[in-house]
């Protein structure tokens, strides 16, 4: 998958879509046997621990920490050596239409707002590649379209190679890349 490209993986439940993502991200359960290589920027990342792979993940649920503010959630994901974190957070929130949400409790966010914060958290962690696991499936049709457009636009603009797992043909069509089906 090239920079800014989105590969879509579709298939019925139990076909191995989520297992594929777990393998790439480095958290496949030891009960599973796997082999092969995963190249990111020309480097095989399979021997690296999950936290060293620099893979960004976006799931069905935003998975925001309830005990941290919106800014705290974003700061948590940023590399330790990142400079000007507060400014990056403020600029990022402004960029996704959530200016001034820094101190908000994540529990007070709507589904769309929480999805936007989860996307920004992913981008601020400075990944080398991104995995999307049904990230729009819990949103209503209109909100799903809006968030899908935002996510795909931001990932393309960031030139991040992305793999999307979905059951939704609208997701695959809007991703605009190659579609692979697992059986």
For each of these PLM feature ranges, what is it?
Residues 159-165:
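Conserved H-loop
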Residues 29, 48-49, 68-87, 95:
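ABC-type ATPase nucleotide-binding domains, specifically the catalytic core motifs of the NBD
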